[in-house]
Amino acid sequence: MSERGNRKTQIGVVVSDKMDKTVVVKVDRLIKHSVYNKYIKRSAKYKAHDVDNSCKTGDRVLIVETRPMSKDKRWKVRQIIERNA
C-alpha cells in the first residue's frame, strides 16, 4: 500500500473503545512555557478508525492522518505498539 506524501503520525493511548470501528486516542505532548521555561504536559484526544475492532482501552497505538471518514474522525490506527496487560 503506497502512501502519498508524508502523513502526520502520533503515538497515544486508547481511552475508549465503545464505538464500532472507532477508538478515542489520547496523545500527550510537552510544551515549554515562554516566560517560566518550565515544561507543561498538554494532551489532545483524537477519534481514530480501527478496522478490525482490535484495540482495547489502555493499548498504546500509532495513528496516522487520513482522509475525513466522518465529522470527527480523521485518523487511522496503523499499528498497536503495546497491549494493555
From Swiss-Prot:
User: Where in the chain are disulfide-linked cysteines found?
Assistant: none
Q: Which GO terms describe its biological process?
A: translation
Question: Record's superkingdom?
Answer: Bacteria
Q: Which UniProt keywords apply?
A: Ribonucleoprotein, Ribosomal protein, RNA-binding, rRNA-binding
GO cellular component terms, alphabetically, are: cytosolic small ribosomal subunit
The protein's GO terms of the molecular function aspect are: rRNA binding; structural constituent of ribosome
Gene3D superfamilies recorded: Nucleic acid-binding proteins (2.40.50.140)
The answer to whether keyword Thylakoid applies is: no
| Keyword set includes Ribosomal protein | yes
Q: Which InterPro entries does the UniProt record give?
A: NA-bd_OB-fold, Ribosomal_uS17, Ribosomal_uS17_bact/chlr
Give the family, as the similarity comment puts it.
Belongs to the universal ribosomal protein uS17 family.
Q: What does this protein do?
A: One of the primary rRNA binding proteins, it binds specifically to the 5'-end of 16S ribosomal RNA.
Question: What PANTHER family does UniProt report for this protein, alphabetically?
Answer: 40S RIBOSOMAL PROTEIN S11 FAMILY MEMBER, SMALL RIBOSOMAL SUBUNIT PROTEIN US17M
Q: How does it assemble?
A: Part of the 30S ribosomal subunit.
UniProt protein name? Small ribosomal subunit protein uS17
